[in-house]
Amino acid sequence: MDTPIHVVAVVASQAGGNTDRLVGRVLEAGRDSQAGVTVTAIHLGAGPLDQARVEGYVQSLAGADAVVLGTPMYRSTYAAVLKELLERVPRGGPSERFEGPLRAKAVGIVATGGSHHHFLGVDPLIDLLVRYFGAYVVPPVLYGVIRSSGGDAPMDPGLAEDAVRFGRALVALASAIQRDERLGDARAQI
């Protein structure tokens, strides 16, 4: 029997753009992959993020079973507004239990760029999620090369298929974490 899964997507760009469209395809595939999957999308826009917005976003992340982080790549790194949000997500200190809204959750990274040259720019984000927040990152990162801006170009069929597989894998990982309490015991080491 499938357990309910709630997926929250944080999109570090404007609604309707290339990153948003690719994240949308992932969310649609995840929702369609099993009964009981619900999705919510948060658009960070250009920032800056005020404290009230950050607190609301953190509550949304805490209530999620799986998270998608969508970001365009600029100068071989992920969007500054996503970095700003993650820097303000609580995790706990050395004397605490390292609890936080991303700990032991399935997290999928969806990135877009104008070329393949920016692909490795997500590595610091993977490291942050796994080592600092104690999240389970869905491999591999979904990276889409989209050369037109504004979200009006047709999506490459191969990329669309990858997005479907990625969405299904995200929900499958979140379901596995829910079913096996040992996976939920993961803790950040530092």
Language-model features: locations:
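N-terminal beta1-alpha1-beta2 submodule of the flavodoxin-like/Rossmannoid cofactor-binding fold
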Residues: 1-98, 161-171, 175, 179-190
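A short, mixed-charge helix-start or loop-turn motif at secondary-structure junctions
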Residues: 9, 108-111, 152
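Residue-level detector of flexible, active-site-proximal loop/helix-junction positions
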Residues: 14, 46-48, 114, 144, ...
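Polytopic transmembrane helical bundles with strong interfacial aromatic enrichment
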Residues: 22, 146-153
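Short, glycine-/small-residue-rich phosphate/pyrophosphate-handling segment
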Residues: 103-145, 161
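Conserved anion/nucleotide-ligand pocket segment
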Residues: 139, 152-158
